Every structure is written in C-alpha cells, then in structure tokens.
C-alpha cells in the first residue's frame, strides 16, 4: 500500500450540516429551529437549571452540611520501616524525595510508627505520630517539627 492509496474509513469524515439552503434540502426556511419561540431566535439559549421563572430545583431543595476540605492538610505518610539503612543523620523532605520514599504533591511529611528504628536520626518533618515519636526518642533521635504552609 502506498501513501497516496490511504483513505479515511467510511463514515469518518462527516459533512457539515448546511442549513437555510432551500426547501428541498430539508433544512430550509426555519433551518431546523421550528417556528418562533425563544429557541428559534439568535442567542436564544437558556442557562442550565432555568425553569421558565419557576423556582429552580437547586433552590427548592434544602441545603445541608459543610466541609472544610479546602483547608485540609494532606501529609505524605512515611513509616519507620521505610527508613531502614539510610546513612544520613538528618532526614528531611528533600532526602525522602531523593531516595524515592515520598513521591507526588503533598502538603507535608508525617512519620508513622510502623516498623523499628535502631539508628539515631534527626527528623525535620511536619508531623509525627505518637508511636513514631516514642520509637525515635527511644533510639536516641530528635524531632524538629516544621510548620506546614497549606
């Protein structure tokens, strides 16, 4: 097959609907808009949810609840088990991203207590769980909490 033999699949190219081009075309006179009325006029589209002046459904039903997700802080969870064998003494976000423990967009880092830790590390993170704090201090490590900026 040569490049000049390539043709689009049947039905792949659809002709534009030409309206107002004579009665026999099937789209003449009113151009498929029917007779009179708001939808027949130019710019005669009505917004979504408009019910002709009647109180719209979205305003008729009661409003309930509240959420504060806009201000929620999403921490990247890091377990102590993931930190085994790290040679550096100071563990911060840049190091965790460099070794691939933390990936993606997060508001901060939270150290969780799953696993054991033997070496004394200094953690510069945004949050620490109670069990992780206990294990870190037991191993002789320190925790420096960073204030997270959402």
Swiss-Prot record:
UniProt keyword list: Ribonucleoprotein, Ribosomal protein, RNA-binding, rRNA-binding
Record field: compositional bias (Basic residues): 30-39
GO CC annotation, single: cytosolic large ribosomal subunit
One example of a Gene Ontology biological process annotation: translation
Keyword Zinc-finger among UniProt keywords: no
Domain of life: Bacteria
Gene3D superfamilies referenced in this protein's UniProt entry, alphabetically: 3.100.10.10
Classification via InterPro entries: Ribosomal_uL15, Ribosomal_uL15/eL18, Ribosomal_uL15/eL18_sf, Ribosomal_uL15_bac-type
GO molecular function, one term: rRNA binding
UniProt entry tagged with the keyword Zinc-finger: no
Signal peptide: none
Region described as Disordered: spans on this chain: 12-43
Role, per record: Binds to the 23S rRNA.
Family: Belongs to the universal ribosomal protein uL15 family.
Subunit structure: Part of the 50S ribosomal subunit.
Stated name of the protein: Large ribosomal subunit protein uL15
Lineage: Bacteria, Pseudomonadati, Verrucomicrobiota, Methylacidiphilae, Methylacidiphilales
């Amino acid at each position: 097959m040569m490049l000049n033999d390539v043709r689009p699949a049947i039905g792949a190219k659809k002709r534009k609907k030409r309206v107002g081009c004579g009665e026999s075309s099937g789209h003449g006179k009113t151009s498929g808009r029917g007779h009179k009325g708001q939808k027949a006029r130019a710019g005669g589209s009505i917004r979504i949810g408009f019910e002709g002046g009647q109180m719209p459904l979205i305003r008729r039903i009661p409003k309930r609840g509240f959420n504060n997700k806009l201000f929620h802080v999403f921490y990247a969870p890091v377990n102590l088990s993931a930190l085994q064998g790290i040679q550096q003494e100071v563990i911060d976000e840049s190091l965790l991203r460099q070794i691939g423990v933390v990936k993606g967009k997060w508001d901060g880092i939270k150290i969780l207590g799953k696993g054991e830790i033997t070496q004394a590390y200094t953690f510069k993170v945004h949050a620490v769980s109670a069990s992780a704090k206990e294990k870190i201090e037991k191993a002789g490590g320190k925790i420096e909490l960073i204030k997270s900026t959402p």
